[in-house]
UniProtKB/Swiss-Prot annotation:
GO terms for cellular component: cytoplasm. L-aspartate binds at T132, N136, D137. Keywords: Amino-acid biosynthesis, Arginine biosynthesis, ATP-binding, Cytoplasm, Ligase, Nucleotide-binding. Belongs to the argininosuccinate synthase family. Type 2 subfamily. L-citrulline binds at Y100, N136, R140, S193, T202, E204, E281. This is Argininosuccinate synthase. GO terms for molecular function: argininosuccinate synthase activity; ATP binding; protein homodimerization activity. ATP binds at A18, F19, S20, G21, G22, L23, D24, T25, S26, A44, G130, T132, D137, D195. Its EC number is 6.3.4.5.
Length: 444
């Protein structure tokens, strides 16, 4: 068995812990200190919409026994990776045409690299976090951690039998903190769990594990419950502007900071409940899970970006963009966002697709994912209404005689296709009988 993963607490050694300030990591930090480890706490500021005071989290970690506690601002890098995902269409999960924007995998890519880099600065080479053995994050963090620090060792309290036996549940952890002089009150248990960052929110587990439980039990944290008729949502006209594949303006207001632009996109999309979806997905270990997702800003930017993609690029380029986007989305989901095969796909899309995406898209947002595209403007559009106008136009790009020639050339492949279908009929793969879908394949 690999010695990269430590199954017992490394006493007397520095142990970095990704500290959220919640019950699990608070109890784990205090427990590790009492058992003889030297815990260092690292908190990622990912612009979580449900976090009010980031500066209070490191102070809390120090109170629980951290040797040192640091707040790492990851927002700029997260915004950069989120925009890269949009440029590449790196989204492989969708239901009814509504994608999951891989917001949690993007957050893990940033957290896993930036926190471990901060640990290296403090000469901390053992890392722990709150991911469980059934989920995706345990593998994502493992990969990103070792990519950043090849000498890293992994210690997870939730894989330590002693920790589980002593503090195996929320009640036990809460009592442990109270017994040690901390006035800890458990939050009201929700019917599901939530994980979020600036790009989106994930709601899953507990009641949401039952497919008979719908989205309506979720209380959105990035927007409104658009399904509730009591919630007033007025139609809103929005413009989104891209330059060289990068979103730069919303409603005519230019942003020099990608973080500020994404936060404003969240506010705009959130007013309508845009980007919420209900997905069944395959986890890395191939078991299926179900999640309810929010990503109002990502959805808004994605809609505008794809509109420009279809108006600017040719059919084969769009096809490769979509196919490669699905492949890249899966690599991102698996924790391989910085692997060579992912970098190759990213480079292709960002260089040859995104660089041409300059323009402004005007939309009307209504409730949920209901929207209308009102206008598409770009100096790079290859869409020209005159080319296929049903009206008579001067200097038409082609005339009826040209089309006759083009259709005549089709005789070659139509003849080949008919021949192949005849072979299939002779071998029994297709039937040429009366009620067949291809009854005319007889030799007459």
């Amino acid at each position: 068995m690999s010695n990269t993963i430590l199954q017992n607490l490394p006493k007397g050694q520095k142990v970095g812990i990704a500290f959220s300030g919640g019950l699990d990591t608070s109890a784990a930090l205090l427990w590790m200190r009492q058992k003889g480890a030297v815990p260092y706490a690292y908190t990622a500021n990912l612009g979580q919409p449900d976090e009010d005071d980031y500066n209070a989290i490191p102070k809390k970690a120090m109170a629980y026994g951290a040797e040192n506690a640091r707040l790492i601002d990851c927002r700029s890098q997260l915004a950069h990776e989120g925009i890269a995902a949009i440029q590449c269409g790196a989204f492989h999960i969708s239901t009814g045409g509504i994608p999951y924007f891989n917001t949690t995998p993007l957050g893990r890519a940033v957290t896993g690299t930036m926190l471990v880099a901060a640990m290296k600065e403090d000469d901390v080479n053992i890392w722990g976090d709150g991911s469980t053995f059934k989920g995706n994050d345990i593998e994502r963090f493992y990969r990103y951690g070792l990519l950043t620090n090849p000498n890293l060792k992994i210690y997870k309290p939730w894989l330590d039998v002693q920790f589980i036996e002593e503090l195996g549940g929320r009640l036990e952890m809460s009592q442990f903190l109270i017994e040690n002089g901390f006035d800890y009150k458990m939050s009201v248990e929700k019917a599901y769990s939530t994980d979020s960052n600036m790009l989106g929110a994930t709601h899953e587990a507990k009641d949401l594990e039952q497919l008979s439980t719908g989205m309506k039990i979720v209380k959105p944290i990035m927007g409104v419950a658009f399904w509730d008729e009591k919630v007033e949502i007025k139609p809103e006209t929005v413009t989104v502007t891209f330059e060289d594949g990068v979103p730069v303006a919303l409603n005519g207001k230019h942003f020099d900071n990608a973080v500020d632009l994404i936060l404003e996109a969240n506010r705009i999309g959130g007013r309508h409940g845009l980007g919420m979806s209900d997905q069944i997905e395959n986890r890395i270990i191939e078991a299926k899970s179900r999640g309810i997702y929010e990503a109002p800003g990502m959805a808004l930017l994605h809609i505008a970006y794809e509109r420009l993609v279809t108006g600017i690029h040719n059919e084969d380029t769009i096809e490769q963009y979509r196919i490669n986007g699905i492949r890249l989305g899966r690599l991102l989901y698996q924790g391989r966002w910085f692997d060579p095969q992912a970098l190759m796909l990213r480079e292709t899309a960002q260089r040859w697709v995104a660089k041409a995406i300059t323009g402004t898209v005007t939309l009307e947002l209504r409730r949920g994912n209901d929207f209308t595209i009102l206008n598409t403007e770009s100096p790079n559009l290859t869409y020209e209404a005159e080319r296929l106008s049903m009206e008579k136009v001067e200097d038409a790009p082609f005339d009826p005689v040209d089309r006759i020639g083009q259709l005549t050339m089709r005789n070659l492949d139509v003849s080949d296709t008919r021949g192949k279908l005849g072979i299939y009929a002779q071998t029994g793969l297709l039937s040429a009988i009366k009620d067949s879908v291809l009854p005319q394949l007889g030799k007459k």
